[in-house]
């Protein structure tokens, strides 16, 4: 809603379903959590490799987690807590202090819905204030996340390839690549970035399907693909690659400056 306030919202049960819908319909945009400041990568890399959708933008969203329960419930009554694995990990100190049993579910909002429908006062969910309002739940404890500066990076993605014209803004270029199988391939492939003074903000490996000897790499760099130094660096990288694919060029979110 922050990004597309007038858009029709289509809920999906899984990340794979989100990617699949966008892959089948050019008019659909998906907003996918990619990484978290506390717990790191969310785990959608394999879907980025699988579908190769275009990235249009990034959005950083501050995260606050709340313990939600049925109206009239007290924290001392709670034995089981339900939420997405990331929310549970990000609230681990509170969970441990309260001696709660963790139960992993597909998402935070779905966990709140489960609590609302199951009508068991020994159960609670970790979710947002909006979920509490939607499902008529009490907020038993507010801001239970381990770190108060918690934030999640989201990617806005879709099927059509769209790229901003190079201007004065700060940009991120995102791409994936697979190296040729030879000694020191990764070391040699990254030399062009060092020589041309290009900063890599992310470099992550992921095993190719059914293999632990062949890897794809997911990379973000500071800059626009049309900048000469970026082009030279990527040309150098290409000499060492079996596969190379640009995922997107987009303005760097101002949150990065904080």
Indicate where each model-derived feature is located.
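Domain-level signature for soluble enzymes in the chorismate/prephenate branch of the shikimate pathway
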Residues: 1-258
């Amino acid at each position: 809603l922050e990004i597309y306030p007038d858009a029709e919202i289509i809920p999906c049960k899984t990340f794979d379903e989100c990617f699949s819908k966008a892959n089948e319909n050019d008019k659909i945009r998906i907003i996918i959590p990619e990484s978290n400041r506390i717990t790191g990568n969310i785990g959608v890399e394999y879907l980025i490799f699988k579908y190769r959708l275009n990235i249009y933008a990034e959005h950083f969203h501050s995260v606050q987690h709340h313990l939600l329960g049925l109206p009239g419930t007290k924290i001392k009554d709670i034995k089981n807590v339900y939420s997405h694995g990331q929310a549970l990990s990000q609230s681990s100190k509170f969970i441990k202090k309260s001696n709660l049993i963790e139960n992993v579910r597909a998402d935070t909002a779905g966990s709140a819905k489960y609590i609302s429908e199951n009508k068991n006062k020994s159960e609670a969910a970790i979710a947002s204030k909006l979920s509490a309002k939607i499902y008529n739940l009490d907020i038993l404890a507010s801001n239970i996340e381990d770190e108060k500066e918690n934030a999640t990076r989201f990617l806005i993605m879709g099927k059509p390839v769209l790229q901003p014209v190079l201007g004065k803004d700060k940009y991120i270029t995102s791409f994936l690549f697979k190296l040729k199988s030879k000694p020191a391939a990764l070391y040699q492939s990254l030399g062009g970035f060092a020589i041309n003074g290009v900063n890599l903000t992310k470099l992550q490996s992921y095993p190719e399907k059914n293999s632990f000897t062949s890897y794809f790499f997911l990379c973000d760099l500071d800059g626009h693909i049309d900048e000469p130094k970026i082009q030279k660096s990527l040309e150098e990288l290409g000499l060492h690659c079996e596969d190379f694919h640009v995922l997107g060029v987009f303005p760097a979110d101002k949150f990065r400056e904080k």
